[in-house]
Amino acid sequence: MALERSDVEKIAHLARLGLSEADLPRTTETLNNILGLIDQMQAVDTSGVEPLAHPLEATQRLRPDAVTETDHRDAYQTIAPAVEEGLYLVPKVIES
């Protein structure tokens, strides 16, 4: 599956990316190369291969789940333009 220029323009619009006319050919080629690599990986027969969660058989040493830092939320929120009930208020960017 190869992407056309119009596909890349639509993807850029949906992702809110500003691509210049000069960037479109290079971006289209890069995305097509990525999709080609994905096609190659999907073509490999892995029917006899067990799923692998991690390449190394190692045990993770996890630290205890304990609070190690003090709460600085109030100090950080004093410089925020708008805060309500401990949450930062930001302008709406996605229209419904």
Curated annotation (Swiss-Prot):
<dbReference type="InterPro" id="IPR003837">
    <property type="entry name" value="GatC"/>
</dbReference>
<keyword id="KW-0648">Protein biosynthesis</keyword>
<keyword id="KW-0436">Ligase</keyword>
<dbReference type="GO" id="GO:0006412">
    <property type="term" value="P:translation"/>
</dbReference>
<comment type="similarity">
    <text>Belongs to the GatC family.</text>
</comment>
<keyword id="KW-0547">Nucleotide-binding</keyword>
<comment type="function">
    <text>Allows the formation of correctly charged Asn-tRNA(Asn) or Gln-tRNA(Gln) through the transamidation of misacylated Asp-tRNA(Asn) or Glu-tRNA(Gln) in organisms which lack either or both of asparaginyl-tRNA or glutaminyl-tRNA synthetases. The reaction takes place in the presence of glutamine and ATP through an activated phospho-Asp-tRNA(Asn) or phospho-Glu-tRNA(Gln).</text>
</comment>
<dbReference type="GO" id="GO:0070681">
    <property type="term" value="P:glutaminyl-tRNAGln biosynthesis via transamidation"/>
</dbReference>
<dbReference type="InterPro" id="IPR036113">
    <property type="entry name" value="Asp/Glu-ADT_sf_sub_c"/>
</dbReference>
<dbReference type="GO" id="GO:0005524">
    <property type="term" value="F:ATP binding"/>
</dbReference>
<keyword id="KW-0067">ATP-binding</keyword>
<comment type="subunit">
    <text>Heterotrimer of A, B and C subunits.</text>
</comment>
<dbReference type="GO" id="GO:0006450">
    <property type="term" value="P:regulation of translational fidelity"/>
</dbReference>
<protein>
    <recommendedName>
        <fullName>Glutamyl-tRNA(Gln) amidotransferase subunit C</fullName>
        <ecNumber>6.3.5.-</ecNumber>
    </recommendedName>
</protein>
<dbReference type="Pfam" id="PF02686">
    <property type="entry name" value="GatC"/>
</dbReference>
<dbReference type="GO" id="GO:0050567">
    <property type="term" value="F:glutaminyl-tRNA synthase (glutamine-hydrolyzing) activity"/>
</dbReference>
<dbReference type="GO" id="GO:0050566">
    <property type="term" value="F:asparaginyl-tRNA synthase (glutamine-hydrolyzing) activity"/>
</dbReference>
